[in-house]
Curated annotation (Swiss-Prot):
First-level EC class: oxidoreductase
Gene: MIOX
Coiled-coil blocks: none
Chain residues that bind substrate: 26, 82-84, 124, 138-139, 217-218
Originating species: Sus scrofa
Protein name per UniProt: Inositol oxygenase
């Protein structure tokens, strides 16, 4: 039996009445943005292959794209609207502060967790570097094995993916061993994996939970759909509650009320100075 959908179980700890109706988030069957969202996932599920992901690791693994601070990266996201997101049609920089502030109110004693809220989508600067959105945004999934049922648009978007014609990659386990651990899975390329690798490269001093949340927060088929358990080890199951806790704020703090970014910047600059100071390699 699959785990229950966190969107039906979890609720934000702050101002639940002010949030959008929970059942209306992540609606992939109707809504004004649906055509845009479907096109993005169709491209993603056609072209995200083992070979493609390995090439992207090689292309961006040297972190020579740009040198900038964390808040400069946040400011860059003013120019990005995520075309895979059915919930919002405003710049990602606002979502970064919304998520961070939601976590801060619910977990005032965990300053590293507040910073994760700000950092979690900064890998989307790849779009502003010229990468197509289907190679940056949206839900992630392991390549090298058959996509499982809870992947968004699973039944209607993978028909042209060449890996599904491969006798190994088209099986449930694919190129993996049972319970190999998600750290050993090759995830579809996007802002999660890029940001995780960037944080390691720049030696962020955040706890392991922060790195894990960043790397797998878009892996909805796992943390929400309950799929891909055949790849999980004990560490993954131990970390799952952290990812699900983060997901409450990633999802349910989206709204039209824009935070006062200028008022918030000094607090988050202090966290950046503590955990990831200075000019960083992106």
């Amino acid at each position: 039996m699959k785990d229950p959908d966190p969107s039906q179980v979890y609720r934000p700890d702050m101002d639940p009445e002010a949030a959008k109706d929970k059942g209306s988030f992540r609606n992939y069957t109707s809504g004004p943005l649906l055509d845009r969202v479907f096109r993005t996932y169709k491209l993603m599920h056609t072209w995200q292959t083992v070979d493609f992901v390995r090439k992207k690791h090689a292309q961006f693994g040297g972190f020579s794209y740009k040198r900038m601070t964390v808040l400069e990266a946040v400011d860059m996201l003013d120019g990005l609207v995520d075309e895979s997101d059915p919930d919002v049609d405003f710049p990602n920089s606002f979502h970064a502060f919304q998520t961070a502030e939601g976590i801060r109110k619910a977990h005032p004693d965990k300053d590293w967790f507040h910073l994760v809220g700000l950092l979690h989508d900064l890998g989307k600067v790849l779009v502003l570097a010229g990468e197509p959105q289907w190679a940056v945004v949206g839900d992630t999934f392991p390549v090298g094995c058959r996509p499982q049922a809870s992947v968004v648009f699973c039944d209607s978007t993978f028909q042209d993916n060449p890996d599904l014609q491969d006798p190994v990659y088209s099986t449930e386990l694919g190129m993996y061993q049972p319970h190999c651990g998600l750290e050993n899975a090759l995830m579809s390329w996007g802002h999660d994996e890029y940001m995780y690798q960037m944080m390691k490269f720049n030696k962020f001093s955040l706890p392991g939970e922060a790195f894990y949340i960043i790397r797998f927060h878009s892996f909805y088929p796992w943390h929400t759909g309950g799929d891909y358990r055949q790849l999980c080890n004990e560490q993954d199951l131990a970390m799952l509650p952290w990812v699900q806790e983060f997901n409450k704020f990633d999802l349910y703090t989206k709204g039209s009320d824009m935070p006062d970014v200028d008022e918030l910047r000094p607090y988050y600059q202090g966290l950046i100075d503590k955990y990831c100071p200075g000019v960083l390699c992106w």
